[in-house]
């Protein structure tokens, strides 16, 4: 599916079997966490610590993924060191996908682990066609890279 900057692979964040399938498809370590994308902050209700639900940075829908303390009810496969990586999307395709699912998705770049991301939909289709359940059509947003990642508590930039 298209995002603001690159094509992604993802699934229902609360479906551990589907998350495991994404890990297998990418050849990715299960110890690496995913970015969680949602259409609005309400979809983060059981994912992030309630103290951070109304942070203006999180609500801005900028192309920034925030590392936020995890909610105590957040599934363990979504957390790393009691934190989660979350982004409220402004991309219409992903926004509608999350709304239709009525919840967040995990997201990772459409490539094999430790390879460069691919922004050619034909190459992505050739690479993943028989491995994924569905390829969502749509244009990329106006960004030309992966999202910036920042820690919401320390404001440290982890990826530019």
Predicted segments with their positions:
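Active-site-adjacent structural elements in enzyme catalytic cores
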Residues: 2-160
């Amino acid at each position: 599916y298209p995002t603001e900057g690159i094509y992604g692979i993802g699934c229902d964040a609360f479906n551990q079997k589907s998350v495991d399938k994404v890990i297998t498809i990418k050849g990715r370590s299960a110890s690496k966490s995913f970015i969680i994308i949602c259409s609005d902050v309400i979809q983060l209700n059981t994912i992030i610590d309630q103290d951070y639900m109304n942070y203006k940075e999180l609500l801005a829908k900028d192309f920034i993924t925030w590392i936020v303390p995890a909610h105590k009810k957040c599934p363990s496969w979504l957390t790393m060191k009691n934190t989660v990586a979350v982004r409220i999307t402004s991309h219409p395709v992903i926004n509608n996908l999350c709304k239709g699912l009525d919840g967040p998705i995990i997201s990772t770049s459409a490539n094999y682990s430790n390879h460069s991301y691919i922004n050619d939909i034909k190459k992505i289709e050739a690479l993943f066609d028989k491995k994924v359940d569905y390829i969502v059509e749509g244009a990329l947003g106006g960004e030309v890279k992966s999202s910036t990642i920042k820690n919401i508590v320390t404001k440290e930039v982890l990826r530019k």
